[in-house]
Design a protein with these regions (language model features):
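Structured C-terminal helix/loop/strand segments within mature extracytoplasmic catalytic/sensor domains
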Residues: 57-200
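Active-site-proximal helix/loop microenvironment
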Residues: 1-61
Length: 200
């Protein structure tokens, strides 16, 4: 049995870790197969945000080691010019965000004890970066984050790409087809009774 199969011990360990950080019982996890043939887990946004919040403040040696590795090598997370890397660099490794598939972005803000999870309903990946930056700025206006979200780029690239991944070209060379920005309101709620778990 290959390691990517659900019954392999590696996948069982992964599911146990997902349960540990999200608080969702392994039996209740939605399971599928991703583009790499490995098991993929479906979670509610709240569970994703909770996992990132818990991981961001955990003193568990493995969490500390992983956070230190990410802070030391931010380019390995996504690459130059990508928000996942830019956020790590701009915050000295204290804040971390990771792009997911189908319009998902999650972030941990350890100095504020927060985790974030975004999902663009139609799976549009282009709108995620401006949405996350706008959300960080809105939260930063209300809660100290340990960094200045106003210094983050609104969009990593304002140029729209054609369907084949190449930039659209006009007579005068590279042409920008427009940009993206987020427009929404943010209402923070006070934790309800029972929400006061570590990292919520």
């Amino acid at each position: 049995v290959g390691y990517e199969k659900l019954e392999h011990p590696v996948q069982r360990r992964i599911l146990a870790e997902v349960e540990r950080w999200t608080g969702v019982a392994a039996a209740d996890l939605g399971l599928g197969v991703d583009g790499c043939t490995a098991v993929s887990v479906a979670l509610p946004l709240r569970a994703m945000a909770l996992a990132y919040a818990r991981f961001g403040v955990s003193g568990d040696p493995s969490a500390v080691r992983l956070r230190a590795a990410v802070a030391a090598h931010p380019v390995m997370i996504a690459g130059e010019g990508r928000l996942c890397t830019d956020l790590l660099v701009a915050t000295g490794g204290t804040a971390f965000a990771k792009l997911g598939a189908d319009g998902v972005y999650c972030a941990m803000l350890p100095q504020a004890g927060l985790g974030l999870a975004l999902k663009v309903e139609d799976g549009d990946m282009r709108s995620l970066t401006p949405a996350l930056v706008a959300l960080l700025r809105a939260i930063g206006d209300r809660v100290p984050l340990g960094f200045d979200p106003a210094r983050l780029p609104e969009s990593v690239s304002a140029a729209c790409r054609a369907g084949d991944g190449e930039y659209a070209r006009g007579r005068d060379g590279l042409a920008s087809l427009g940009g993206a920005s987020a427009v929404f309101g943010l209402a923070l709620r006070r934790p309800a009774p029972g929400d006061n778990q570590e990292g919520t």
